[in-house]
Amino acid sequence: MRGSDPDAAVFYLAKMLDAGEDVKFIARRIMICASEDVGNADPQALIVAVSAAQAVERIGMPESQIILAHAAIYVACAPKSNSVVEAIYAANRAVESSNGSVPVHLRDATTSRIAASADAHGYDGRPGDPDASIRGTQYKYAHNYPEHYVRQQYLPDDIKDAAFYLPGENGREKEIAAWLRHLKERDL
């Protein structure tokens, strides 16, 4: 599937089934490939794979081979991207090296200190923010801004400019990359 060869994918699926491989194991591998090797290039691939896994549990053999073939061929034919994998690995490395914590203006105001700060300093967001009374003074409610986006710091200070998710140019990720560029250009 990773190599975008639907013929090889369905052939090796048939070989695994012929050898007695558990259909649930095969379905799990298809789900993993859909996320790991396709990712946001075609988000529908994971939905197809999960649906196939659920159907296999209900249907059984011999019909499950058709369901697995459907999913394996879909995933094999989908545009590929490992940007999601790279993003979580980069974020994991940052967690190991970062001392930072969630910026105060993003924290849940369940502590009296944060709630008192919000009350003492007022809220600088726009009217109608349902979170205005429970957040710090710098929080801005994205849905009250054009395109439901507002620039504010979301990462800890020591990694505030980090970029973990770098969408590729295949499939849906090309659109995601363009959207993220558009938002960043608005910030200039």
Language model features by range: what are they?
Residues 2-147, 155-188:
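Terminal-proximal interaction/regulatory segments of ATP-powered molecular machines
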